[in-house]
């Protein structure tokens, strides 16, 4: 082996070993806690000396029956509370010892909770993302703190049921768990909508650019899903959808349903349709996709 190649190989090996020991030392010296609380890549033109530290804020809420949420770029998550209470959490960005930036405004009036995303001043910034280190070396609480970044989380009791929900998001995802409502309007412009263990009745759902995923979710009344550019995927769907009247249509995609369903998929040119007559007393679910598949997994 040539001398310069040997020197390069030895130098690389030494740097790799040294870097590994420095990484381990940094982790045990409090590096994970630093990563969870500090944005290493933020350079705010208006205040370059201020480190921007994200703090997870949790607000206790009174019980409510109506939910009205409008967000621009934040993700919204609804999940049941281990304490069986109502709460709201979000990341608060601290710019100095005395100043902080709250990404949302919220209010409760009567039985209605209203949440709005603030129109914050935009700054030029460069971001260094080292959150993968937290996912590898962090504990469960630290991993959850990372997952809450750019996320508004609503905690609700397991048996909570809403009379009316209105959820709108321009450029973010909706992750809805254990959400039950008698009536609802859900719209996402550019993002995915994910349901799990939900119960939706008389709900109108629209998505311009993103997928809709539903797992173990029941539908009743008259519910409609319209997706312009994205797939509509149902999992664990046979038991919950088989009794319903189904109207499925896609202009540029496939329709796949379990073989146990009574209807038949019809195809003509690029258009596919499926219709199923449900049992008396059960609701109707209509799904229309302009450019995407509709797949019902048993």
Placement of each model-derived feature along the sequence:
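Right-handed parallel beta-helix
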Residues: 52-66, 75-83, 99-200, 213-214, ...
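A short, sequence-level motif marking secondary-structure junctions
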Residues: 81-85, 182, 239-240, 262-264
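Short, surface-exposed interaction patches in beta-rich subdomains
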Residues: 196-207, 211-298
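Generic detector of contiguous secondary-structure segments
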Residues: 71, 97-111, 234-249
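Beta-strand elements of well-folded, non-transmembrane domains
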Residues: 71-73, 92-94, 121, 171, ...
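Short beta-strand/loop motifs in extracellular/secreted proteins, especially
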Residues: 76, 86, 102, 163, ...
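Short Gly/aromatic-enriched secondary-structure transition segments
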Residues: 83-95
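Alpha-helical transmembrane segments and their membrane-interface anchoring/capping motifs
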Residues: 1-82, 125-127, 133, 137-140, ...
């Amino acid at each position: 082996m040539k001398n310069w190649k040997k020197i390069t190989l030895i130098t690389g090996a030494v740097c790799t070993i040294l870097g590994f020991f420095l990484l381990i030392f940094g982790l045990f010296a409090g590096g994970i806690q630093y990563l969870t609380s500090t944005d290493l890549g933020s350079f705010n033109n208006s205040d370059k000396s201020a480190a921007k530290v994200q703090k997870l804020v949790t607000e206790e809420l009174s019980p409510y029956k109506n939910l009205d949420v409008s967000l621009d770029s934040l993700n919204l998550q609804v999940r049941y509370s281990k304490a069986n209470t109502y709460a709201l959490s979000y990341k608060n960005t601290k710019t100095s010892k005395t100043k902080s930036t709250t990404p949302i405004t919220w209010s409760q009036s009567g039985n209605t909770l209203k949440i709005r995303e603030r129109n914050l001043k935009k700054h030029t910034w460069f971001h260094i993302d080292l959150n993968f280190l937290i996912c590898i070396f962090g504990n469960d609480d630290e991993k959850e703190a990372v997952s809450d970044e750019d996320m508004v989380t609503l905690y609700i009791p397991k048996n909570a049921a809403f009379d009316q929900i209105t959820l709108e998001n321009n450029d973010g995802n909706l992750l809805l768990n254990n959400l039950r409502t008698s009536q609802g309007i859900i719209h996402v412009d550019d993002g995915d909508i994910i349901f799990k263990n939900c119960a939706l009745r008389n709900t109108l759902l629209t998505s311009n650019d993103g997928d809709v995923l539903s797992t173990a979710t029941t539908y009743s009344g008259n519910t409609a899903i319209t997706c312009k550019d994205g797939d509509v995927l149902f999992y664990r769907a046979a038991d919950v959808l088989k009794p319903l009247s189904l109207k499925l249509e896609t202009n540029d995609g496939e329709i796949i349903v379990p073989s146990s369903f009574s209807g038949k998929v019809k195809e003509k040119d690029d258009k596919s349709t499926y219709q199923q007559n449900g049992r008396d007393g059960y609701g109707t679910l209509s799904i229309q996709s302009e450019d995407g598949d509709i797949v019902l997994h048993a």
